[in-house]
């Protein structure tokens, strides 16, 4: 190639990096980026990654720390703290990233929002989005819908020996419908959650079948 963009998977902003992130994600990508710089010139290569600032693991990690009195700040503060720790770790391992930002941090966050909005708007204008109601877990005691990590039960897949099953997947990788989860419990209050309908937008993938 004459120009190249090398990317490394974006870690969640719920914690610092561990060695698996370094050895399994960033070192291989770094080796490839350095190889390309040697072959086509550093000015023609961009090695990019960053912190994923959204998702259930972040919400759940933040909630647990706040409830335990171990963090006093907003969820944005929590993510930014972990982002800075991640960046420091990558620098200490001399990972040669050109850009390490975040999907909701600073200018990169603004760009992420603009592109996401434009993308969704285009899909909507072309009729490729459909609004559908699906059942989701609701904690009547907490008065809130639960994200995937806030529900735990037993995996409904026959023969599965997973010790942790969440709203729609277990830690062994089995997927299932939320209503099939066995003996679900809310991690917020410990009560059995209700199933209530929630409307979301879905991409009309069948419209693109050949």
What do these predicted ranges mean?
Residues 1-210:
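N-terminal, positively charged nucleic-acid-binding surface of large information/translation enzymes
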């Amino acid at each position: 190639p004459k120009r190249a963009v090398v990317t490394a998977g974006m870690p969640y902003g719920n914690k610092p990096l561990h060695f698996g992130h370094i050895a399994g994600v960033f070192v291989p990508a770094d080796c490839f980026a350095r190889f390309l710089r040697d072959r086509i010139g550093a000015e023609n290569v961009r090695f990019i990654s960053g912190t994923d600032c959204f998702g259930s693991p972040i919400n759940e990690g933040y909630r647990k720390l706040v409830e335990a009195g171990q963090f006093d700040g907003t969820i944005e503060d929590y993510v930014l703290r972990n982002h800075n720790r991640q960046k420091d770790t990558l620098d200490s391992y001399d990972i040669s990233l050109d850009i390490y930002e975040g999907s909701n941090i600073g200018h990169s966050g603004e760009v992420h929002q603009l592109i996401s909005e434009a993308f969704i708007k285009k899909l909507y204008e072309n009729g490729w989005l459909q609004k559908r109601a699906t059942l989701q877990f609701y904690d009547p005691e907490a008065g809130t819908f639960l994200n995937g990590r806030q529900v735990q039960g037993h995996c409904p897949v026959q023969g599965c020996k997973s010790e942790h099953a969440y709203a729609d997947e277990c830690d062994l990788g089995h997927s299932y419908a939320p209503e099939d989860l066995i003996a679900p419990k809310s991690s917020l209050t410990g009560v059995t959650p209700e199933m209530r309908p929630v409307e979301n937008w879905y991409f009309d993938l069948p419209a693109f079948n050949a």
